[in-house]
Amino acid sequence: MRYVAAYLLAALSGNADPSTADIEKILSSVGIECNPSQLQKVMNELKGKDLEALIAEGQTKLASMPTGGAPAAAAGGAATAPAAEAKEAKKEEKKEESEEEDEDMGFGLFD
């Protein structure tokens, strides 16, 4: 991902065909070390491709991927409803108790 981001940064700044040295310079400017074999692989994959088309293709691929928590929450929603109601009732009871404690402001020590 870091190599793709550096490549896009170089390309969007006006360098139509960034070299590996350009990418290494960008990454080293922020303290990131380069793995030459991974960088070369990314460069070979991106060479000669239209960046806007790649971005559009990536967006469609990301849109088709399922999100992490949504299916599990939808499936277990009906089963957790009674538990949620019980938690709310317990919270209300605790809240009422704490309000009573606040009213005496600590003067109930000698009652």
Swiss-Prot record:
Entry's Gene Ontology cellular component terms: cytosolic large ribosomal subunit
Compositionally biased intervals (Low complexity): 63-84
Coiled coil regions, renumbered to chain: none
Pfam families: Ribosomal_60s (PF00428)
InterPro entries membership: P1/P2_N_sf, Ribosomal_P1/P2, Ribosomal_P1/P2_euk, Ribosomal_P2
Keyword Ion transport: no
GO biological process terms, semicolon-separated: cytoplasmic translational elongation
Origin superkingdom: Eukaryota
Keywords: Phosphoprotein, Ribonucleoprotein, Ribosomal protein
CDD domains, per database record: Ribosomal_P2
Modified sites of kind Phosphoserine: S98
Start-end of Basic and acidic residues biased regions: 85-97
GO MF annotation list: structural constituent of ribosome
Chain positions covered by the region annotation Disordered: 63-111
UniProt entry tagged with the keyword RNA-binding: no
Family: Belongs to the eukaryotic ribosomal protein P1/P2 family.
Subunit structure: Part of the ribosomal stalk of the large ribosomal subunit; P1 and P2 exist as dimers which assemble on the P0 scaffold.
Main function: Plays an important role in the elongation step of protein synthesis.
PANTHER family per the UniProt record, alphabetical: 60S ACIDIC RIBOSOMAL PROTEIN FAMILY MEMBER, LARGE RIBOSOMAL SUBUNIT PROTEIN P2
Name of the protein: Large ribosomal subunit protein P2
Lineage of the species this protein comes from: Eukaryota, Metazoa, Ecdysozoa, Arthropoda, Crustacea
